[in-house]
């Protein structure tokens, strides 16, 4: 059987592409603001580094390929790739990591396939996974939200840690990651997985400061709600379609609910899955990438549901605390197959 992506390349109108990318960038403002509020200025520094790296990397490749640099950069796709990677990594990760991940995403995962519209995998998630596999410690060193943090780095401190590894007063990531309980903090998903494996009960885990939020992990619930708000705005602007976010979130919630009902002592409750990690960012800003997602309505529902199932399985049974990036890439692999079996039948066509 030969699989074909019938509508590739997906982006034919550069002005339309530029407008959609700009809408996505604007929709990201609430999520970025929430991450800045809870995790400090490091997020902004990472966004600036990633944006500059993405534009320079794209310009370099276009120059080598003798293509128009200015016209292509105006589509804002490189900028969006850098932004999505920057908000996915810890805010005080070393500067060279975000540069390396962004350059890899733009050059290897996008331009080597032929540029926008030709890449089969989401470039930002390729860059993220490369960094996660290569530097797992740095990529899981998140700061505690400011509500439970002992040391809150300012703008200058954030720059110093990102570029030198420590603040002017000698503080490093180990001291900055301390929570009010004197324990180095991780994300709610990472904390849950580590604690369950250590033999702690769910009742004990829920007493940790990181779970003192109203619905889920402190800070993270509001970050996810902010990304949700941006995603709803994208739907209202008709920049994305509802099929993928809805099927992804419904499937994730359903799997999490069933798992929690059958094994409440080892699996996280559905609200933790929905409002922790990169759930809403993935649902509305990453999975909906028109280049790497399914192109039919039925296909989008299947694609989103598959990603939701994979996220829950990786979070619950895998070796990584948050499975959004891996789920996105694994779902990307299935897109030609999904599109092949869900493409509309041509009028008058009969199976011979």
UniProtKB/Swiss-Prot annotation:
<dbReference type="Pfam" id="PF03116">
    <property type="entry name" value="NQR2_RnfD_RnfE"/>
</dbReference>
<feature type="transmembrane region" description="Helical">
    <location>
        <begin position="322"/>
        <end position="342"/>
    </location>
</feature>
<keyword id="KW-0472">Membrane</keyword>
<feature type="transmembrane region" description="Helical">
    <location>
        <begin position="267"/>
        <end position="287"/>
    </location>
</feature>
<keyword id="KW-0249">Electron transport</keyword>
<feature type="transmembrane region" description="Helical">
    <location>
        <begin position="214"/>
        <end position="234"/>
    </location>
</feature>
<comment type="subunit">
    <text>The complex is composed of six subunits: RsxA, RsxB, RsxC, RsxD, RsxE and RsxG.</text>
</comment>
<feature type="transmembrane region" description="Helical">
    <location>
        <begin position="42"/>
        <end position="62"/>
    </location>
</feature>
<keyword id="KW-1133">Transmembrane helix</keyword>
<protein>
    <recommendedName>
        <fullName>Ion-translocating oxidoreductase complex subunit D</fullName>
        <ecNumber>7.-.-.-</ecNumber>
    </recommendedName>
</protein>
<dbReference type="InterPro" id="IPR011303">
    <property type="entry name" value="RnfD_bac"/>
</dbReference>
<keyword id="KW-0288">FMN</keyword>
<feature type="transmembrane region" description="Helical">
    <location>
        <begin position="123"/>
        <end position="143"/>
    </location>
</feature>
<dbReference type="GO" id="GO:0005886">
    <property type="term" value="C:plasma membrane"/>
</dbReference>
<dbReference type="InterPro" id="IPR004338">
    <property type="entry name" value="NqrB/RnfD"/>
</dbReference>
<feature type="transmembrane region" description="Helical">
    <location>
        <begin position="301"/>
        <end position="321"/>
    </location>
</feature>
<feature type="transmembrane region" description="Helical">
    <location>
        <begin position="20"/>
        <end position="40"/>
    </location>
</feature>
<keyword id="KW-0812">Transmembrane</keyword>
<feature type="transmembrane region" description="Helical">
    <location>
        <begin position="78"/>
        <end position="109"/>
    </location>
</feature>
<keyword id="KW-0597">Phosphoprotein</keyword>
<keyword id="KW-1278">Translocase</keyword>
<keyword id="KW-0285">Flavoprotein</keyword>
<comment type="similarity">
    <text>Belongs to the NqrB/RnfD family.</text>
</comment>
<dbReference type="GO" id="GO:0022900">
    <property type="term" value="P:electron transport chain"/>
</dbReference>
<keyword id="KW-0997">Cell inner membrane</keyword>
<keyword id="KW-1003">Cell membrane</keyword>
<feature type="transmembrane region" description="Helical">
    <location>
        <begin position="148"/>
        <end position="168"/>
    </location>
</feature>
<dbReference type="GO" id="GO:0055085">
    <property type="term" value="P:transmembrane transport"/>
</dbReference>
<keyword id="KW-0813">Transport</keyword>
<feature type="modified residue" description="FMN phosphoryl threonine">
    <location>
        <position position="187"/>
    </location>
</feature>
<feature type="transmembrane region" description="Helical">
    <location>
        <begin position="242"/>
        <end position="262"/>
    </location>
</feature>
<comment type="function">
    <text>Part of a membrane-bound complex that couples electron transfer with translocation of ions across the membrane. Required to maintain the reduced state of SoxR.</text>
</comment>
């Amino acid at each position: 059987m030969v699989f074909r992506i019938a509508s590739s390349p997906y982006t034919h109108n550069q002005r339309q592409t530029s407008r959609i990318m700009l809408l996505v960038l604007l929709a990201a403002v609430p999520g970025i603001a929430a991450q800045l509020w809870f995790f400090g200025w490091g997020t902004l520094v990472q966004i600036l580094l990633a944006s500059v790296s993405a534009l320079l990397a794209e310009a370099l490749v276009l120059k080598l390929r003798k293509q128009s640099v200015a016209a292509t950069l105006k589509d804002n796709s490189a900028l969006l790739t850098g932004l999505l990677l920057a908000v996915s990594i810890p805010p005080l990760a070393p500067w060279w990591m975000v540069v390396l991940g962004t350059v890899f995403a733009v050059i290897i995962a996008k331009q080597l396939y032929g540029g926008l519209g030709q890449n089969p995998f989401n470039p930002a998630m390729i860059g993220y996974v490369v960094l996660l596999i290569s530097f797992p410690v740095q990529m899981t060193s998140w700061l505690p939200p400011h509500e439970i943090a002992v040391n809150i780095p300012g703008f200058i401190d954030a720059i110093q840690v990102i570029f030198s590894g420590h603040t002017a007063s000698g503080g490093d990531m180990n001291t900055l990651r301390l929570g009010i309980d004197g324990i180095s903090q991780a994300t709610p998903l990472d904390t849950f997985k580590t604690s369950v494996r250590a033999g702690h009960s769910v009742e004990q885990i829920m007493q940790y400061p990181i779970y003192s939020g109203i619905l889920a992990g402190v800070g993270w619930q509001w970050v996810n709600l902010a990304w949700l708000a941006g995603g709803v705005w994208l739907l209202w602007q008709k920049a994305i379609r509802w099929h993928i976010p809805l099927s992804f979130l419904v499937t994730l919630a359903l799997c999490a609910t069933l798992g929690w009902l059958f094994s409440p002592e080892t699996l996280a409750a559905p609200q933790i899955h929905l409002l922790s990690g990169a759930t809403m960012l993935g649902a509305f800003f990453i999975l909906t990438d028109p280049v790497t997602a399914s192109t039919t309505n039925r296909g989008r529902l299947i694609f989103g549901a598959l990603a939701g199932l994979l996220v829950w399985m990786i979070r619950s049974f895998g070796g990584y605390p948050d499975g959004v990036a891996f789920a996105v890439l694994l779902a990307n692999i299935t897109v030609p197959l999904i599109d092949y079996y869900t493409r509309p039948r041509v009028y008058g066509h009969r199976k011979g």
